[in-house]
Regions:
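Generic hydrophobic secondary-structure packing signal
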Residues: 44-48, 52, 68, 72, ...
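Conserved beta-strand-loop-beta-strand hairpin that lines the nucleotide-binding pocket
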Residues: 1-35, 81-171
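Generic detector of contiguous secondary-structure segments
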Residues: 52-67, 92-100
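Helix-loop-beta hinge of the Bergerat
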Residues: 29-63
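Conserved ATP-binding N-box helix of the HATPase_c
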Residues: 63-90
């Protein structure tokens, strides 16, 4: 996981609610970007959920809000994995997650990205989808229930899927 600060006021020592404060962490004061790259394999969704949950705590989300965020991230990852499997073959793509933490909000972008090895891209044929049900649309509609903003795009030429979700802290 890689985090970088993009702008905003400086953080104060002990600001994130470290042990000994006796309460939930104080919400962050600046804007930070964290990037996570994972294999496009269902088993790795847990790592994406852990990152989302931890960053949700940093923003100040309640446990219910974190649960809702985790449901949305899980579904977005499942859609990205399906897009990667269809485009580059099962287990060959990657997921790229960008988390942008700001005061009172967390933005999550999930993308399916091609495998690194060019040889693999040329050798792998896209998997076929035999399902009669459009699981992609069902998943996108489910995500809308748990986030405040959603943008979805799937490039028909490259097969890359991009989903941007925003959840706001509501008090």
């Amino acid at each position: 996981m890689r985090a970088s600060r993009s702008s905003g006021p400086s953080a104060h020592p002990g600001h994130a609610g470290h042990a000994g404060h006796g309460g939930p962490p104080a919400p962050i004061a600046g804007t930070y970007i964290t990037e996570v790259k994972l294999p496009a394999i269902v088993d790795y969704i847990l790592a994406a959920k852990r990152a989302a949950g931890a960053l949700g705590l940093v923003v100040g989300f309640s446990l219910q809000e974190i649960d809702e965020l985790n449901i949305a991230v899980t579904q977005a990852c499942e859609n990205a994995i399906a897009a990667a499997n269809e485009q580059w073959g099962r287990g060959n793509g990657q997921l790229k997650l960008l988390f942008k933490t700001q005061p009172r909000r967390l933005e999550v972008e999930v993308r399916s990205v091609p495998p690194r090895a060019v040889e693999m891209q040329q050798a792998v044929r896209p998997a076929r989808r035999d399902e009669a049900v459009d699981y992609e649309s069902v998943g996108v509609n489910m995500i809308r229930l748990f986030v405040d903003e959603l943008r979805y795009h799937r490039d028909q030429q490259t097969g890359i899927m991009r989903m941007r979700m925003v959840k706001y802290l509501i008090e």
